UniProtKB/Swiss-Prot annotation:
Organism: Drosophila melanogaster
N6-acetyllysine, modified sites: K6, K13
Principal localisation: nucleus
SUPFAM superfamilies according to UniProt: Histone-fold
Entry-annotated residues carrying Phosphothreonine: T81, T83
Region (Disordered), start-end ranges: 1-20
Gly residues: bias regions: 1-14
Protein name in UniProt: Histone H4
Gene3D superfamilies noted in UniProt: Histone, subunit A
PANTHER family: HISTONE H4
Gene (name only): His4
Record localization: Nucleus; Chromosome
């Protein structure tokens, strides 16, 4: 068992999956404890209950912007795979330079 499901190894070989996971609002996957850990890393001691939904909203907007720029770089290079460098350039374009991922 390779853990790849029913798709096989190659690209584009996957047939119809029997139990397709329904994509709900995935932003709820950013759990309350995860947000709490991020806040602790930033030095926060107490957290209001209203913070969690607000944080999810801000994170969603931020990721949408970064991913949109990264996909734009990918499409311009006529590729179908978003690379780490696409994300690095997208972050740099938004004024958030990230070191340690090449380039």
């Amino acid at each position: 068992m390779t853990g790849r499901g029913k798709g096989g190894k190659g690209l584009g070989k996957g047939g119809a999956k029997r139990h397709r996971k329904v994509l709900r609002d995935n932003i709820q996957g950013i759990t309350k404890p995860a947000i709490r850990r991020l806040a602790r890393r930033g030095g926060v001691k107490r957290i209001s209950g209203l913070i969690y939904e607000e944080t999810r909203g801000v994170l969603k907007v931020f990721l949408e912007n970064v991913i949109r720029d990264a996909v734009t770089y990918t499409e311009h290079a006529k590729r179908k795979t978003v690379t780490a460098m696409d994300v690095v350039y997208a972050l740099k374009r938004q004024g958030r330079t990230l070191y340690g991922f090449g380039g």
